[in-house]
C-alpha cells in the first residue's frame, strides 16, 4: 500500500429501505475514517436498473443526514474522483475491461450454463460446480465460430493458480485455496460490466485503502484480490486495500436479521422516536464496544476508541429491549432545551401538535417526561392532556373504572374544596393543599388519595408529576376537569 491517508467507502445500492445492518456498516466505516483522520467516501452502486430507485437513493441520503454520518466525498458533496454514482462511470469500467483483455488478464467466454453442466456430467463431476474455465484458451478460429453463431461472450478474469490469502482486519488470516474459485464473469453477454468488476475498479480508482463490509461478502474477496493483482499489472490500481468483514446481525432465533423483519427497518426506529445518538450507540454494540462496563457512549467517544481489530467476528444479535434501554439513556443525557426542541419537532411531524403551542409550557412539560420515556413517541400519551382541545379531552375508561368509582366521590369533593381556596396556583401550594385535605384530614393513603385526582385531571393513571401537571394545566382547566369527573361519579 503506497498511500498514508486512510480512505474508506460506504457504497449501498439504492434498493428498498435502509436497514440497520447497512447503517452499522456505514457507522463502522465512518468511525474508522474519523479515528484515523481519513476520508469517508459515499458512493452509490446504482447499476441494477431493474431494482434501483430514486426513492431509495433519497432514503439513503435522508438516513445518513438524520444520523449525522457526514461524508467527505460523494453525491451532493463532490470530490476529486467524481462521479460518485456508479451508473455514471460506465466508460471508466469499460476502459478497464478493454485493458484486461488486451493484456491477457481476461478473456471472452462463450459457454452457456447448459454446456458447462453437460461438461461436468460427462467428466463425472457435480453439474452445479459452476464455470469450468473451458474458454480460457480458445483459438481465434474457435472464437470466430462462436461469434458467427451469434453468441455474445461474457468477459471473465483469468484466476491465478496460487492460494489467495489476506489478513482480515476482523477475522484474521483467511485463505482460499488455488482452484477453488473459477474464472468469474466481469461483464454480461451484452457487454455491461457486473458488480464483480465495477466495485473493485471504483475502489482502485478512488484510492480506497480499507474495505469494511458485511460478512456476506466474504466469498467475493478472493475474486477481488485476483482482480487487484491484475489491475496492478496493467497500471489501473496502485495497491490492494485491506479487507475487514463485519459479523452478521442476527434476528430472533438463529436467523440472520432480514429486511422483512420490522426491527431491521431504520425508519421504523426513527418513527418510534429513537434519537440518532441512541440508535448509533446501540448499532456500535453489534460487534464492538468500548468496554464491558461502558455500554452508553457518545459518537465522539466511539471515534476516539474505535479499533477495527477489536470487532468481534461472532454474529451479533439485535435485541430490541437493549436498543430501547440505550436510547432511553441518551434521551436522559440531552440538555433539557435540546430535548424539548427535538420532542416538539417529533410531535409536530407526527401530527400531535400544531404550529402554535405555548412554548414555555411545552418546555416545562418536556422536562417532566424526559426521564420517563424510552422513545419520543412515548411522550404523547403522557403530555396530551396538556395540549388537546378541551372538547376532545377524555378519561381513559380503564383508568376511570379503577379510580373513579363511588368511593372517589369524597376524595374529589375534598380536593375541589381545598383547591378552590388555593391562592397561588403553583406546584408547592397544590401539594400542600391536597396532602392536607386528602391524607391528613381524610386519612387516606397517598395512592388512594391522589389517584382519582390524577385520573380526573390528566385522563390517565400514568402522567408526569401531579402537582407540576396541574400547575401547567392552570386553575380553570384543572378545576373544570375535577368538577366534570365528580359529576360522573355516583354519590
From Swiss-Prot:
ATP binds at residue 259. It catalyses: tRNA(Glu) + L-glutamate + ATP = L-glutamyl-tRNA(Glu) + AMP + diphosphate. Pfam families: Anticodon_2, tRNA-synt_1c. Residues 111-134 are annotated as: Disordered. A motif ('HIGH' region) lies at residues 12-22. The keyword Aminoacyl-tRNA synthetase applies. A motif ('KMSKS' region) lies at residues 256-260. Keywords: Aminoacyl-tRNA synthetase, ATP-binding, Cytoplasm, Ligase, Nucleotide-binding, Protein biosynthesis. The keyword Nucleotidyltransferase does not apply. InterPro entries: aa-tRNA-synth_I_cd-bd, aa-tRNA-synth_I_codon-bd_sub2, aa_tRNA-synth_I_cd-bd_sf, Glu-tRNA-ligase_bac/mito, Glu-tRNA-synth_I_codon-bd_sub1, Glu/Gln-tRNA-synth, Glu/Gln-tRNA-synth_Ib_cat-dom, Glu_tRNA_lig_a-bdl. It is found in: Cytoplasm. Coiled coil: none annotated. Belongs to the class-I aminoacyl-tRNA synthetase family. Glutamate--tRNA ligase type 1 subfamily. This is Glutamate--tRNA ligase.
